[in-house]
From Swiss-Prot:
<dbReference type="GO" id="GO:0046982">
    <property type="term" value="F:protein heterodimerization activity"/>
</dbReference>
<dbReference type="GO" id="GO:0006366">
    <property type="term" value="P:transcription by RNA polymerase II"/>
</dbReference>
<comment type="function">
    <text>Functions as a component of the DNA-binding general transcription factor complex TFIID. Binding of TFIID to a promoter (with or without TATA element) is the initial step in pre-initiation complex (PIC) formation. TFIID plays a key role in the regulation of gene expression by RNA polymerase II through different activities such as transcription activator interaction, core promoter recognition and selectivity, TFIIA and TFIIB interaction, chromatin modification, facilitation of DNA opening and initiation of transcription.</text>
</comment>
<dbReference type="GO" id="GO:0005669">
    <property type="term" value="C:transcription factor TFIID complex"/>
</dbReference>
<keyword id="KW-0805">Transcription regulation</keyword>
<dbReference type="GO" id="GO:0006367">
    <property type="term" value="P:transcription initiation at RNA polymerase II promoter"/>
</dbReference>
<comment type="subunit">
    <text>TFIID is composed of TATA binding protein (TBP) and a number of TBP-associated factors (TAFs).</text>
</comment>
<dbReference type="GO" id="GO:0016251">
    <property type="term" value="F:RNA polymerase II general transcription initiation factor activity"/>
</dbReference>
<dbReference type="InterPro" id="IPR019473">
    <property type="entry name" value="TFIID_su8_C"/>
</dbReference>
<dbReference type="Pfam" id="PF10406">
    <property type="entry name" value="TAF8_C"/>
</dbReference>
<comment type="similarity">
    <text>Belongs to the TAF8 family.</text>
</comment>
<dbReference type="InterPro" id="IPR037818">
    <property type="entry name" value="TAF8"/>
</dbReference>
<protein>
    <recommendedName>
        <fullName>Transcription initiation factor TFIID subunit 8</fullName>
    </recommendedName>
</protein>
<dbReference type="InterPro" id="IPR009072">
    <property type="entry name" value="Histone-fold"/>
</dbReference>
<keyword id="KW-0539">Nucleus</keyword>
<keyword id="KW-0804">Transcription</keyword>
Length: 222
């Protein structure tokens, strides 16, 4: 890797570099290559391949913003003359890398697809805050704009149904409030034991309001 970095810097017009700069370049290039090859492995798995194919590599380079035409210039520096097979393959990939593979192409004609899905034109009305290097917006049939505020119902039948549903919810909430406010019966075993202990000690049960309240609170409702 040091030799590759030195060759690149020499082509850019640098004659020498320090050890610290070399270490920084090696670390940066190593990190970049690891992340790039990890993305290539993901594209290969998504294509259900065990080994990256030419299509996978072409798609990977396009996503990295590396044009296929630049590879031919780099290969000409090290392969002189460039083999015709490699040259033809690069030309073919440069022209077909953006095309849809035949296995994913629709069997319907474009007119029928337009009738089924609507307009397939890509919206180019890019807002000012969208930078240019981002991909274009998808076709209009792939997403649907939803209103921010819900539309109020206008049908009388639907309004009556919603009112009935809300009244039932209110009635259910009132019943729960009334059930909670009803006094609970003090028939728990703990309360009976408490009354027995008070009678044995000649104490008045009504004088222990806090204990009596707690026993009523935690008694199970029947």
């Amino acid at each position: 890797m040091e030799a590759v970095i030195a060759n690149i810097l020499q082509q850019l017009g640098f004659d020498s570099m320090t050890k610290a700069a070399e270490a920084s370049f090696v670390e940066a290039v190593d990190k970049y290559l690891r992340n790039s090859f990890r993305e290539l492995a993901l594209h290969t798995q998504l294509s259900k391949h065990t080994i990256p194919t030419t299509k996978d590599v072409a798609l990977w380079l396009n996503l990295l913003n590396i044009p296929m035409s630049s590879l031919q210039t780099e290969l000409e520096k090290y392969l002189k003359p460039l083999p015709p097979a490699i040259n033809d393959e690069l030309d073919r990939l440069a022209n077909e890398s953006q095309d849809i593979p035949s296995k994913f192409k629709s069997s319907l004609d474009s007119k029928m697809v337009s009738q089924l899905l609507g307009s397939l034109a890509v919206s180019q009305n890019r807002p000012a805050y969208v930078v240019n290097h981002l991909p274009p917006f998808p076709a209009s049939h792939t997403y649907m704009a939803t209103p921010v505020y819900p539309v109020r119902p206008t049908s009388p039948k639907q309004i009556r149904e919603l009112a009935t549903q809300e009244s039932r919810l209110a009635e259910h909430a009132l019943r729960k409030i009334l059930n909670v406010n009803q006094p609970r019966s003090a028939d728990s075993p703990r309360h009976a034991s408490f009354e027995k202990a008070c009678s044995e000690l000649n104490l008045d049960v009504s004088s222990f309001h806090l204990v009596n309240w707690e026993s009523q609170k935690w008694s199970s409702q029947r």
